[in-house]
Each structure stands twice: as structure tokens, then as C-alpha cells.
Amino acid sequence: MSRVQLSLNVTDFDAAVAFYSRLFSTQPAKLQPGYANFAIADPPLKLVLNAAGNGPGGTINHLGVEVGSTEEVNSAGDRMAAEGLDTNPAPGTVCCYALQDKVWAHDPDGLPWEYYTVLEHVETP
């Protein structure tokens, strides 16, 4: 299953977790100090909250598409490169309390997008 990811910087982490829990009627799938991710079924969305250390609160940290396998990540990277986009493959990246394979591209304004798959969950950010 693929789903869009929205990663937000938030100034009041606890208030944001409470708000989005109520908004989507679900609790975070992963909750760590300053980091929460919600695996929302309806609408299909991976929502990530980051304590605002990477940018001002209320801003987008980055966007992404979660896919089911490394093959899908590689296929997305190949497709983007064939379309003339600059890509940055990042296999074996530890990020967001998970080991991931991913590929990055940036939109014309510099907004980062990633295609990624989670290989395993880990205890470090």
C-alpha cells in the first residue's frame, strides 16, 4: 500500500499530538520525545509531527510517499531520474526511529519529497 506522508514542524508538541489524535480519531503509531507518527487509514495518510527544531512551527518539514518495498523506492527513483529530476538515493538511512531505503527530490522551491520504505523499526531517531 502506498500513502502520502506529511511531516510537520510543531511548536507545542503535546498539543499537536492531542489535536491530530482527535482530528483523525486515532493515536500515534509511534510516539517518541519530540516525534510522533500517525498511520491514518481514512484518509490514507502518514502524518508525522516534529517538535519545531528543524524549522518554525506550523511549517512543512518535508513530504513523502511511503511504499511497500525497496523495489518500489528504486522504481520511483528511476522514474524521477528519467523525467529529468535530480534525485538523491539514500538506502539504509536511519530516520524517524526506523531503518529506511529512500530517494529524495526537491521541488522548484526547494521543498523536499521522499519515496521511502521502512525496513525495520529502531530505537534511535
What kind of region is each of these model predictions?
Residues 51-55, 120:
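A short, sequence-level motif marking secondary-structure junctions
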Residues 35-37, 52, 91-95:
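Short, solvent-exposed loop/turn elements at beta->coil junctions and helix N-caps
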Residues 3-11, 39, 55-125, ...:
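Vicinal oxygen chelate
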Residues 25-30, 68, 91-95:
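Short linear motifs in intrinsically disordered
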Residues 2-46:
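Core segments of cupin and vicinal oxygen chelate
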Residues 27, 47-48, 86-91:
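A short linear hydrophobic-aromatic micro-motif
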Residues 46-50, 114:
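Conserved beta-strand in the GNAT
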